[in-house]
């Protein structure tokens, strides 16, 4: 069960860091209607 907790913490931390970077500097991606 510890593996599940560690995975959850890892995903949570990565998500927070990703959001922090995204909100810190606006995404300048020249992708208009391209995904």
Swiss-Prot record:
Which example biological process does GO assign this protein?
photosynthesis
Give the record's subunit note.
PSII is composed of 1 copy each of membrane proteins PsbA, PsbB, PsbC, PsbD, PsbE, PsbF, PsbH, PsbI, PsbJ, PsbK, PsbL, PsbM, PsbT, PsbY, PsbZ, Psb30/Ycf12, at least 3 peripheral proteins of the oxygen-evolving complex and a large number of cofactors. It forms dimeric complexes.
Query: Which coarse location class describes where this protein primarily resides?
Result: plastid
Q: Where found in the cell?
A: Plastid, Chloroplast thylakoid membrane
Q: Which domain of life is it from?
A: Eukaryota
Membrane topology summary: Single-pass membrane protein
> A Pfam family for this UniProt protein?
PsbT
Which protein, by its recorded name, is this?
Photosystem II reaction center protein T
Q: Mind telling me which SUPFAM superfamilies this protein's record contains?
A: Photosystem II reaction center protein T, PsbT
Q: Where are the transmembrane segments?
A: 3-23
Give the protein family: Belongs to the PsbT family.
Q: Which UniProt keywords apply?
A: Chloroplast, Membrane, Photosynthesis, Photosystem II, Plastid, Thylakoid, Transmembrane, Transmembrane helix
What is the role of the protein in this entry? Found at the monomer-monomer interface of the photosystem II (PS II) dimer, plays a role in assembly and dimerization of PSII. PSII is a light-driven water plastoquinone oxidoreductase, using light energy to abstract electrons from H(2)O, generating a proton gradient subsequently used for ATP formation.
CC annotations in GO: chloroplast thylakoid membrane; photosystem II reaction center
């Amino acid at each position: 069960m510890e593996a599940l907790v560690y995975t959850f913490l890892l995903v949570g931390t990565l998500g927070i860091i990703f959001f922090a970077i995204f909100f810190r500097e606006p995404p300048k991606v020249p992708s208009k209607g391209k995904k």
